[in-house]
């Protein structure tokens, strides 16, 4: 499957997960906080207005033939992600985001995981370790905007490291 994780206010709480597979089956939910922090998921949240397109070069569930690939496009409406946050799509704002691809290549074998921004574990529910989505208001290729990390990023990373150290003991 392919998974998208979005934390619009970058606080590690009230974030969204949207998954799809090669058949186009959607699984979407909102989490109040990560599972390892005692988080709860809300599967009743359906990403309103979500549009997806799946393209498959090969067959599904026929292990005897050779498949090439499958791809997905998603259009996620901004309005669907406005629950519990106030960080609009405005130049200079950042969101935390990550992408994950999980594939089972061998029967009874372990899954293979690819991610956009590694979290250091096989656990995507670590929003503090996701990448940054930085909004600009300029046309692509017309300027060299530089990503400005949040002013408190060093403290933020230290506090999360302390949190994980407590969780691991």
Give residue ranges: language-model regions.
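Structural preference for beta-rich elements and adjacent junctions enriched in aromatics
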Residues: 1-163
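Alpha-helix exit/C-cap motif
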Residues: 165-169
